[in-house]
Design a protein with these regions (language model features):
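Structural preference for beta-strand elements that scaffold enzyme active sites
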Residues: 4-6, 37, 71-73, 97-100
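Structural motif corresponding to the early beta-alpha repeats
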Residues: 59-85, 90
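Alpha/beta enzyme core
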Residues: 24-38, 85-98, 119-120
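N-terminal small/glycine-rich loop or linker at the start of catalytic domains
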Residues: 1-16, 43-45, 58-71
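Glycine-rich, proline-tolerant flexible connector loops at the mouths of alpha/beta enzymes
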Residues: 35-61, 76-81, 101-114
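An N-terminal, well-structured beta->alpha segment
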Residues: 18-21, 25, 51-53
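Single conserved hydrophobic/aromatic residue that forms the stacking wall/gate
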Residues: 122-130
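Active-site mouth loops of central-metabolism enzymes
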Residues: 7-22, 72-82, 103-111
Length: 130
């Protein structure tokens, strides 16, 4: 069960690239200050502006930097079911503890479409949804 302070961490950029050094400093500082977990690659973390490679690298990096001291919630949602499945599988393979799957916000499926979207993600990777 998740409890406590679990911030949605920002993704620092420098000269148009993800600034992994600044991200590591920020995450280490937040861990030192007592966070209970972290959410990476959510919309606060610039998920829609990251390339697929950056997204996947950032999840891997957050798991590594956290040193398994706190749970890592990886943003894995997408308007595309196929992409959300890919991100979710990668997050768990990388060691993330939870996947954060937002509802498709651009194409806005009806209730059946939403259930199908989430069900296909869960079937592909038995998730611990958050």
């Amino acid at each position: 069960m998740l409890k406590g302070s679990i911030p949605a961490i920002i993704t620092p950029f420098s000269k148009g690239e993800v600034d992994f050094d600044s991200f590591a400093k920020l995450l280490k500082w937040q861990i030192k200050e007592g966070i209970s977990g972290v959410t990476v690659c959510g919309t606060t973390g610039e998920s829609p502006t990251l390339t697929h490679d950056e997204h996947m690298q950032l999840v891997e990096f957050a798991v590594k930097v956290s040193g398994r001291k706190i749970p890592v919630i990886a943003g894995t949602g997408s308007n595309s079911t196929k992409e959300a499945i890919e991100f979710t599988k990668h997050a768990y393979k990388s060691g993330a503890d939870y996947g954060l799957v937002v509802t498709p916000y651009y194409n806005k499926p009806n209730q059946k479409g939403l259930v199908d979207h989430l069900s296909l993600i869960h079937i592909s990777e038995p998730t611990r949804p958050y």
